[in-house]
Amino acid sequence: MPERRRQSVYQPQRVRVRTDAVGEPTTVDAVAVEAIREEWLVEDRWWTPEPLRRRYFELVLADGRNVVVFREASRWLVQRA
């Protein structure tokens, strides 16, 4: 029987994000961003061949959801709990 790959519940998922001129999210999957509650930068594993650099945003969306999205390289992901 082939081994099935388990996907972690906490694994970030790709998301479509539009940004303004300074790189702050304005929409997430076509839902408007009402507010940016917090923004932070994580830089880790800088001593390895593959360092980690992510810019996180905690957002309030027009549909009432609170989400955390982050930019890593050239892609956006949403962090789900």
Which positions does each model-derived feature cover?
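Non-catalytic peripheral regions of nucleotide-handling enzymes
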Residues: 1-81
